[in-house]
Regions:
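Short, hinge-like loop/turn segments at secondary-structure boundaries
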Residues: 53-57, 106-108, 130-131
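Glycine-rich, Arg-bearing micro-motifs that act as flexible, cationic patches
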Residues: 111-136
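A short acidic, glycine-rich active-site loop
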Residues: 56-71
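Short secondary-structure boundary segments
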Residues: 40-41, 115-117, 146
Length: 146
């Protein structure tokens, strides 16, 4: 672990809690001259069918999901004070826990910042909290923001 952190990864999903996490991560990045990576991840819906009754092509589904993720990132960027911070963004498809952990490894993160609860109530009820799974499996220190 490196302190102060050189690279901070923050996961955003459009929820108020993830925005608070982004704000805190940006403050830490500014205070420590750290690089900030904002990531959003969406799990492709299983068995999703389009209005035609036919499954969408993987390309069409990926494009629609990525557009939604890009909007989440745009909103987070617009709502977060990123002045004076070196930062990047990433949008990915897959299991949020696995993808966020892989991003921490890929970016050589020193700190992961997440909101306590995300936007998906049903996912939390069925699969548990992403923050909880990250807390149990993160190879880097994790800051969970209420």
């Amino acid at each position: 672990m490196s302190w102060p952190p050189q690279v901070i990864v923050v996961a955003v999903d459009g929820s108020d809690q993830s925005q608070r996490a982004a704000d805190l991560a940006a403050s830490l990045a500014r205070a420590h001259t750290s690089r900030l990576v904002m990531i959003t991840v969406v799990r492709p819906p299983e068995g999703w069918w389009g209005v035609t009754g036919q499954p969408p092509s993987p390309e069409a589904l990926s494009e629609a999901l990525v557009e939604g993720q890009q909007e989440i990132l745009r909103q987070a960027e617009n709502r977060t004070d990123l002045s004076g911070i070196e930062y990047g963004t990433a949008e990915e498809l897959g299991d949020p826990t696995s993808v966020i952990l892989a991003a921490c490894e890929r970016e050589s993160a020193d700190l992961l910042v997440v909101g306590r609860r995300g936007a998906g109530l049903v996912e939390r009820m069925v699969m548990g909290s992403v923050a909880d799974r990250l807390a149990h499996h993160s190879p880097v220190p994790i800051l969970i923001v209420p």
